[in-house]
Amino acid sequence: MGDVEKGKKVFVQKCAQCHTVENGGKHKVGPNLWGLFGRKTGQAEGFSYTDANKSKGIVWGEDTLMEYLENPKKYIPGTKMIFAGIKKKGERADLIAYLKSATS
């Protein structure tokens, strides 16, 4: 997949303002991402999701994240994630590699 260290930099630059990754981490504007892989959309306990996120019904994995992170509002219309997305596939792959290591 991608490079974990490069992915950590992407996370810090583009995601950490709204998300945490550690076990027991608090929700910010976006949900804590611990346990992300294998979890259905809209299921982080204690976070207030939109109906669009709750009803999307997909399971987060490398493929679904690759598509979602390119254009979140296209993948889940009605999401409250205000992030425009990451157009570079390599950057998305690095971020996903980091998320896989940091959230489990």
From Swiss-Prot:
What molecular functions are annotated in GO for this chain?
A: electron transfer activity; heme binding; metal ion binding
Task: Please cite one Gene Ontology biological process associated with this protein.
Answer: mitochondrial electron transport, ubiquinol to cytochrome c
Q: PROSITE patterns, per this entry?
A: CYTC
InterPro entries tied to this protein: Cyt_c-like_dom, Cyt_c-like_dom_sf, Cyt_c_1A/1B
Q: Where are the transmembrane segments?
A: none
Q: Name one GO cellular component term.
A: mitochondrial intermembrane space
What post-translational modification information does the record give?
Answer: Binds 1 heme c group covalently per subunit.
Origin superkingdom: Eukaryota
Primary residence: mitochondrion
Q: Which residues carry this modification: N-acetylglycine?
A: G2
Transport recorded as keyword = yes
Query: Any idea which UniProt keywords this protein has?
Result: Acetylation, Electron transport, Heme, Iron, Metal-binding, Mitochondrion, Respiratory chain, Transport
Report the locations given in the UniProt record. Mitochondrion intermembrane space
Q: Where does heme c bind?
A: C15, C18, H19, M81
Q: Does the UniProt entry include the keyword Protein biosynthesis?
A: no
Q: Per its UniProt record, what PANTHER family does this chain match? A: CYTOCHROME C (PTHR11961)
Question: Would you identify the family this protein belongs to, as annotated?
Answer: Belongs to the cytochrome c family.
Q: What does it do?
A: Electron carrier protein. The oxidized form of the cytochrome c heme group can accept an electron from the heme group of the cytochrome c1 subunit of cytochrome reductase. Cytochrome c then transfers this electron to the cytochrome oxidase complex, the final protein carrier in the mitochondrial electron-transport chain.
What's the protein here called? Cytochrome c
